Amino acid sequence: PTAAKNAIVIGCDIRPSSESLKKATIEGILDAGTDVIDLGMTGTEEVYFATSHYEAMGGIEVTASHNPINYNGLKLVREQSKPISADTGLADIQKIAEQGEFITPAQRGEYELRDDKTAYVDHLLGYIDPTALKPLKVVVNPGNGSAGPTLDLITERLQAANAPIEFIKLNYEPDGSF
């Protein structure tokens, strides 16, 4: 991977408000002089992977997780996908925000779209040997969330490797109207 030491990776779920919240967050990060790698529509686990994979200084998933549709927020991780908490930087961020003393950067950050899930799928499939699998029927239900496209890539790769798995797909198309 291309190292991105001065970058934040960001992705978002399928909620109707996620894309606009992600765009606003990206603009703020760029204005602060930090580069952004936009992963597109992702699950939180993809942001965690990309933060480490691209050697970014942090990651953000725009999501409200299991909360109702009218909620939204930001899940933050530090470098190497380490959790961020009051003890590990969140209190510092709060203090800076409350004081309003922001640094003016020498230049605006740079934006890059990297919505290719290949490295993530390679990582996941690196844990198994498709040829060693026994015949299996698997029902996969991503609940119309952001995992559907990633699961499509996984099933395609396993089928191309002649893995003896039959996939039954339910609720596969991303749909933010839950």
Q: What does each model-identified segment do?
A:
Residues A4-Y71, L153-F178:
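N-terminal small/polar loop signature for handling phosphorylated ligands or for N-terminal nucleophile
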Residues N72-F178:
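Gly/Ser/Thr-enriched, mixed-charge loops and adjacent short helices
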Residues P1-E27, D31-A32, E110-K137:
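An N-terminal, well-structured beta->alpha segment
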